[in-house]
Amino acid sequence: VKTIGIIIFISLLAVGTVWAEDPPSKHYILNNGLSVYIQKRDHIPLVNIVFAVNVGSKDEDQNTNGIVHLLEHLILLGPTQFQTVDEINLEMRRHGAQFNAHTSHDLMTFELSLPAQYWEFGFNILKEKLFHLKLVQPQVDKEKEIIFEELSQHQEDPYALATYLAVEHLFKGHPYQQPVYGVRSVIEKATIEEIETFYKKYFVLSNCALAVVGDVDLAVVDNKIRQGFGHLGEIEESAAPLERDSKPAPPLKKTVKVERYLDINKAHVIFAFEAPPLGHPDQLGLDIINLILGKGINPLLSRALTRMGKPLAHNLQTRYIMMEYGGAFLIYTTMEPKKVNQVRMELIKFLKTLWNFNYSKEDYPLGQQSEVTDYLEAAKSQVKFSHQQFLESGINAALSYARNILFYKLHQDEIDGKREPYMVRVDKTTSADLRNTASRYLSGEKYVMVTILPDKKKGKKVKK
C-alpha cells in the first residue's frame, strides 16, 4: 500500500472539514493504483460510497463524443453479468439504497447511499455494477433513446443551451469544447464494441478513486475494500498505461458573440470568461467574487443592473466551473428583449470597474466604515457556512473526497507543501486580492457572449 498526503490536500481544495474535531479517517493507495479514502461519521446511521473514474468528455473526440455519457447510463441502469435490471432494482429497494451517477468534462462518478446496516450490500452491488458490466443491445438502444430525449430538452432550455455554447466557444481547440451530453449522430451509431473499448480502457483501478463516508468501522471497511478491490490488480497489471494528450486549455484569442433563437418569451444574455482550473491559487479569489457578484440576498450584480429603482434584468446568477485543465466564469441574465443591448453595455461597463472596487470596509476611511457594505466579510461568512452545510451531507462529502484524491494523485508534485489550508486562506483574503483576481479574469477585454432571443424561426447567428 502506498500512502499519500491526502488529508493535507483535502484541506487545500476546500473539502476539509470544519468540525470541532476531525472525524476518524483512513487514506491510502492500493498496490493496483486505486485511491481510497474512508471517514467515520456515526451521528447518522447512513453510509455513502462514491466511486470516481478519471474519464469524461475530455477523453472523447468528434467521433466518440457521447460514448462516455452512454456508458454512464448503461452502468447505472443496465444489467450485470450476474443479475437482470429488475433483479438489481428489487435488491436496491429491499436495502433502501439510492444509486446515481454523473458525467462531467473530467470525471464520471457513481454515488450510492444506504442504511449503515446494509453497507456490505452497497460495496458488493457497486463492485458488480462497475466491474461486471453486461452490454446487451436492447438496453443500449433503450438508453440511447433516453439520452436523445435529454439532448432535445437541453436544446430547448435557454440556460442549458447558453451554457453549452459558452463553454464550446470558450474552449475552442480543446476537448472541453465538446458537450458532456454528447452528439446525437455519434451516440446513434455507437456499437457495443466501441462502448466496450472505452470501458476497458478507462475502468482500470489506477484511474479510479473510492471514498466512503458514514457510520462504519474503519478497520472493517478497510479490510472489505482490500478483499473486494485488491484482487482486481490483475486487470490493472495487464492494462496498458493510459496515454492522454493532457494540456491546459488555450487562451481565448478574441471576443466571440453568439446568438440563438428559441420559442421563449424573455431574452437571455450570458457572458463567459476564462477562469483558473481546479487547484489553482486564484481559485479562492474567484470563489469569493462569485459569491459577491451573483449569490446571496443582495448580489452586487443586481445593484449594477438597477436604474431608477427598477431592475434592467432578472434571474441574475453567476457560476464558476472548475475543471482540471481550465475554468469558466459565467454570468447569466434574463430580461425583456428590448433591453438586451442596454444590459450588455451596462454589464461590460460594470465589470471594468471590478479591478478597483472597494470590496471591504477597510478600503474606506475609519469614519465611513460603519456606513458601507462589507462585501468581503459577508462573502467569507457565506463561504464558511456553505462549506459546513455542504459537508454535513455525507454524499456531498464523499463526492468531494473521491474527486479530489483522484486529482491529487495526478498533480501531487504541483501541490504538496505549497499552500495553506483553504479556510486559513479564506480568512487571509483581502480586498486587494479580489481586485487582482478581477483584473486578471473579469476585465471585460475578451469574453464569449451568448444571447438567446425569443424567435425560433430566425435560426442561428455566430459572430466572431
Enumerate the language-model features and the residues they cover.
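Bacterial N-terminal signal peptides
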Residues: 5-15
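C-terminal regions of mature proteins
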Residues: 209-214, 333, 365-370, 374-464
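Active-site SXXK
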Residues: 65-79
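M16/insulysin-pitrilysin zinc metalloprotease superfamily fold
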Residues: 77-81, 113-144, 296, 320-390, ...
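PAPS/PAP-binding and catalytic site of the sulfotransferase fold
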Residues: 126, 210, 221-228, 347-351
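Non-catalytic beta-strand/loop surface segments
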Residues: 18-59, 81-120, 153-207, 231-280, ...
